[in-house]
């Protein structure tokens, strides 16, 4: 069976063509495109070319999916509708799923995971699993056992209110409020890294060398690399980011008690392992006011190293759930 899978984010669209029998997969072709302003259909047509034997397609999208329809959060595309995509692309079955649902399915169905463990915890096989990841935005999902597998559910938890409990982060919150209500994604994301840097540059360390990080094509990634190279403002920026990320993950852990594991997806964590391992993430993760930290110390916490989890999850969903 020929399956088309896509992972559509605010920055890039990844597409792949896979031959699968539901258990084994053979990737025939894989491409990455800038998401841009054209919409999904032109990108898929460009990718498929003359290929007309695709039976199923599953697209993982960075936004809420309701009734197989989705308006992607960080893209100017019109709403995507699976029924219309079936007609326009001449594909028999099309499903739209949240990108973190796709990531979740790949995590629960993939036997050979590539992980870095931040906290061993005490794994419980029948407990929920939580997934959180920062990139262009902040995504969250959770999974619960169902038979001999799991069922994955989406959330829009990245849009929870940012509620810091230390003075510096509260000053950051006040700074960001100039542009309206502040959700966690405004801080824990690639654009969030840039905003933290600007806050420190403008309000805390105006005499420090700011370098040319903000003029780079991906300033968030440039700032993270600057931190690794010892640049002061970048180091301070990433310290705030990692603490906020840990706190957001801890909030999720308090809600779901994911003793089946909390998995950190997305390129930012995978590309900044040393920053994630320095102890500040886990310290913020377990520091939850009236919640005994011993409880959250029992949650296994892992970084997922494969940054194509969403794409592979869309393949698995098409092969096993459609």
Regions found by a protein language model. Give the residues of each.
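ATP-binding/phosphotransfer module of carbohydrate and carboxylate kinases, centering on a glycine-rich
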Residues: 1-52, 171-322
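Short glycine-aspartate micro-motif
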Residues: 3-7, 56-58, 95, 129-133, ...
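Short, acidic Gly/Pro/Ser/Thr-rich loop/turn segments
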Residues: 13, 64-66, 137-141, 195, ...
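Short amphipathic alpha-helical segments
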Residues: 17-18, 45, 70-72, 108-109, ...
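Active-site nucleophile and cofactor-binding loops and adjacent substrate-binding regions
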Residues: 32-35, 74-76, 95-101, 121-124, ...
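Short beta-strand-loop/turn "lid" adjacent to the catalytic site in phosphate-handling enzymes
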Residues: 49-96, 101-114, 131, 270-274
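ATP-dependent carbohydrate kinase catalytic cores
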Residues: 93-124, 217-232, 239
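Glycine-rich phosphate-binding loop of actin/hexokinase-like ATP-binding domains
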Residues: 117-120, 125-185, 274, 280-296
């Amino acid at each position: 069976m020929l399956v088309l899978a896509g992972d559509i984010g605010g920055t890039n669209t990844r597409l792949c063509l896979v031959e699968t029998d539901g258990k084994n997969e053979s990737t025939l072709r894989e491409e990455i495109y800038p998401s841009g302003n054209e919409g999904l259909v032109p990108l898929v047509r460009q990718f498929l070319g003359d290929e007309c034997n695709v039976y199923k397609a599953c697209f993982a999208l960075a936004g809420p999916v309701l009734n197989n329809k989705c308006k992607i959060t960080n893209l100017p595309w019109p709403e995507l509708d699976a029924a219309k995509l079936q007609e326009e692309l001449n594909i028999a079955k099309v499903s739209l799923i949240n990108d973190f649902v796709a990531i979740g399915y790949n995590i629960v169905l993939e036997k050979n995971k590539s992980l870095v463990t931040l906290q061993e915890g005490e794994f419980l096989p029948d407990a929920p699993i939580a997934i959180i990841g920062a990139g262009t935005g902040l995504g969250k999902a959770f999974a619960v056992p169902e038979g001999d597998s799991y069922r994955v559910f989406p959330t829009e938890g990245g849009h929870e209110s940012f509620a810091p409990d230390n003075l510096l982060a509260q000053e950051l919150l006040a700074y960001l409020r100039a542009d309206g209500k502040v959700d966690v994604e405004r801080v824990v994301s690639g654009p969030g890294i840039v905003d933290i840097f600007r806050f420190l540059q403008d309000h805390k360390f105006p005499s420090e060398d700011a370098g040319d990080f903000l003029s780079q094509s991906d300033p968030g990634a440039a700032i993270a690399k600057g931190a690794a190279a010892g640049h002061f403002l970048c180091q301070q920026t990433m310290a705030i980011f990692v603490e906020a990320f840990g706190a957001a993950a801890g909030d999720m852990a308090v809600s779901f008690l994911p003793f089946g594991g909390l998995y950190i997806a997305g390129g930012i964590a995978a590309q900044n392992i040393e920053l994630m391992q320095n102890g500040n993430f886990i310290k913020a993760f377990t520091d939850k006011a009236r919640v005994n930290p011993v409880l959250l110390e029992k949650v296994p916490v892992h970084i997922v190293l494969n940054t194509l989890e969403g794409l592979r999850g869309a393949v698995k969903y098409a092969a096993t759930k459609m």
